[in-house]
Amino acid sequence: MSKMVVLFLAVFLMNSVLMIYCDPDHYIRAGYNHKYPFRICSIAKGTDLMRFDRDISCSPYKSNAKMSEGFFIIYKTNIETYTFPVRTYKKELTFQSSYRDVGVVYFLDRTVMGLAMPVYEANLVNSHAQCYSAVAMKRPDGTVFSAFHEDNNKNNTLNLFPLNFKSITNKRFITTKEPYFARGPLWLYSTSTSLNCIVTEATAKAKYPFSYFALTTGEIVEGSPFFNGSNGKHFAEPLEKLTILENYTMIEDLMNGMNGATTLVRKIAFLEKADTLFSWEIKEENESVCMLKHWTTVTHGLRAETDETYHFISKELTAAFVAPKESLNLTDPKQTCIKDEFEKIINEVYMSDYNDTYSMNGSYQIFKTTGDLILIWQPLVQKSLMFLEQGSEKIRRRRDVVDVKSRHDILYVQLQYLYDTLKDYINDALGNLAESWCLDQKRTITMLHELSKISPSSIVSEVYGRPISAQLHGDVLAISKCIEVNQSSVQLHKSMRVVDAKGVRSETMCYNRPLVTFSFVNSTPEVVPGQLGLDNEILLGDHRTEECEIPSTKIFLSGNHAHVYTDYTHTNSTPIEDIEVLDAFIRLKIDPLENADFKVLDLYSPDELSRANVFDLENILREYNSYKSALYTIEAKIATNTPSYVNGINSFLQGLGAIGTGLGSVISVTAGALGDIVGGVVSFLKNPFGGGLMLILAIVVVVIIIVVFVRQRHVLSKPIDMMFPYATNPVTTVSSVTGTTVVKTPSVKDVDGGTSVAVSEKEEGMADVSGQVSDDEYSQEAALKMLKAIKSLDESYRRKPSSSESHASKPSLIDRIRYRGYKSVNVEEA
């Protein structure tokens, strides 16, 4: 108490001096230690989930329990995936349609098609880093389609070169950087063909029981990578698409092209799936996969024997492993792969730790714990005890022969009795202590579990012995490592009063924790504000405030110093050793077992961790690839072309009630249809083909108009020639028999002064008229007779049978067959 009084008096005096001479805006350097450095503790998105294992069974140790010494090796199930390289081969065809106009080329449809590379072409890739520039595709109906790179109708070889973009897991090699394009003829459509070979060196992963494997490209193969066609491994892909070759030579790395180093593959598989060809090396599963993995080696162990089980206790791991008494024989090849490894570890541990004082007490034994761990136990015995046992056998033999050695016999009995008594006593003590220790640890773990609900970070930090950030997520703890900041950049503010935006300190609001500024390691020198927490933890932000309490004295620990704040202003810093410690630690007074603290913290099993994930990436990728394969040749396009004004009119008419709604629907449908028609016409006119067709139609219409106009002018200039073209034929006479009328027309002189025309007509009830008339004088009667003669002449030509009618009068084939043997009779003769 006297020290505390002196401390506070010193603080009061220093406070008085500093309030006068010290500027509160200055900083002080905050101290830290190696155990609790300045750090930021927060829960990241990807954290480790842990729980306290309270389901611990403490078997009662009887007085006859046997304890033995030794060391053991623990193997766990190997949950790592089997990783192996896979090559994929595909050929990508690009068809670019275009239309060439004057001075411009229009790109139209572009079709990209992927095809799996055939196996014989994959052999060319693996041997020469080349592929062919042609591709052939056979349709189900037997039709074969062929395509050539750059439309040259030649099957050449193309060299593979690495793609600029590559990742750690994938490397791609191609033959064409940019698709080929050719300018077609003017005003015509054309299509350019480009071919690109794509070879990908990917990494595949398979998980036990190896029923499928996934590539880093996201593709899935539903089959075991160890399937060789006859070993019975799971393989769900079509077997007719699988090709297996033996003693296959291939380029190991395509980066150097055909100059790359080659390797001999004992057995390789090629699988054609959708638009890709896969290839991978087929290995023996027992040689490539080991289901067990070394976890840890306990160099100092204790085995306690109960009625049915063994308890293997480790001081190093602070854990106990329970296993049945029946030992195992590892016969599975995927488990015997660890034999050479653990035998080597046994020899190394014995030679380094026990060779001088202990001897191996028999051979090793293999057990399977209740947690499905494989434990290899090597019992040991002290060499001094073994020497006594061997010496007792020699003394007894000599005792049977020589009697003078009886003293030694009595002495040995006493020694043996003492040894047996001490051994039983020690075994009983160790058994009882182990049981009590187990119960105590069980209670301690239960207490830690309950305390973790109050302060999880403190509990977990004490368990691990270093600063750990923990947060309770339901029934489990999410832990993460704290981020250390630049220790030399941490500065502690002297004032704890809140400063507003104008830089004025508040008289009523204060921070409940001191302000600090710091910077991160390997970052810009920009300082970051925060507040000092417990054990040098930095709390981000400065929102932790409270109402100022005057007077008040607060002491905050930082490193090896205690910082005193009086009325929220730093007044003094004193070493932490000056403050007395409340000693609540109860020390164990038993020297042999003073450090035998058993603490059991069990991690989640791999299955539990996998089930705790919200998104199962494997199932998502498998579903995606299944959907991709199912819809490989399907392409859907959806478009909505409803004009915006139609929706506006419909919304307006909906306010008119039911009638308006119905009328609006009708108008919307009608307007939409008209809009589609108009839009289609406009689109057709905008299309080069539609524009060209309309131009041709316009030219045809203009030509028709010109032809009609010229013909009309010709008719107006020469009506007789246009109306009666046969009048210009060199016909001298035309006879027409119509009743008793006969018309004869000799040469007729035209109105322009040609040959004279004499017309004679004999008609019933009319007199014969003959004579010549002049070019310029015609009587009305003569003109009327001329018109009648022209009319009669026209009718005679019209009544003359045409060639088509003459052909129609001929008998048909059926009539000729029907009336064969008969001869047709001329009508005039008849």
From Swiss-Prot:
Region of interest (Hydrophobic membrane proximal region), residue spans: 634-686, 644-685
Short motif Internalization motif, span: 822-825
Residue ranges, Intravirion side: 710-830
Residue ranges, annotated region (Involved in fusion and/or binding to host membrane): 98-104, 184-191
Cysteine-cysteine disulfides: C41-C482, C58-C438, C131-C197, C290-C337, C510-C548
SUPFAM superfamilies xref list: Viral glycoprotein ectodomain-like
PTM annotation: A proteolytic cleavage by host furin generates two subunits that remain linked by disulfide bonds.
UniProt-annotated glycosylation sites, renumbered to this chain: N155, N228, N247, N286, N329, N355, N361, N486
GO annotations of cellular component type: host cell endosome membrane; host cell Golgi membrane; host cell plasma membrane; membrane; viral envelope; virion membrane
Alphabetical UniProt keywords: Disulfide bond, Glycoprotein, Host cell membrane, Host endosome, Host Golgi apparatus, Host membrane, Host-virus interaction, Membrane, Signal, Transmembrane, Transmembrane helix, Viral attachment to host cell, Viral envelope protein, Virion, Virus entry into host cell
Location(s), subcellular: Virion membrane; Host cell membrane; Host endosome membrane; Host Golgi apparatus membrane
GO BP annotations, alphabetical order: symbiont entry into host cell; virion attachment to host cell
Virion surface side: 23-688
Keyword Membrane included in the entry's annotation: yes
Segment forming the signal sequence: 1-22
Membrane-spanning residues: 689-709
The keyword Oxidoreductase is assigned to this record: no
Assembly information from the UniProt record: Homotrimer; disulfide-linked. Binds to heparan sulfate proteoglycans. Interacts with gH/gL heterodimer.
Record function comment: Envelope glycoprotein that forms spikes at the surface of virion envelope. Essential for the initial attachment to heparan sulfate moieties of the host cell surface proteoglycans. Involved in fusion of viral and cellular membranes leading to virus entry into the host cell. Following initial binding to its host receptors, membrane fusion is mediated by the fusion machinery composed at least of gB and the heterodimer gH/gL. May be involved in the fusion between the virion envelope and the outer nuclear membrane during virion egress.
Family to which this protein belongs: Belongs to the herpesviridae glycoprotein B family.
Name of the protein in its database record: Envelope glycoprotein B
High-level lineage: Viruses, Duplodnaviria, Heunggongvirae, Peploviricota, Herviviricetes
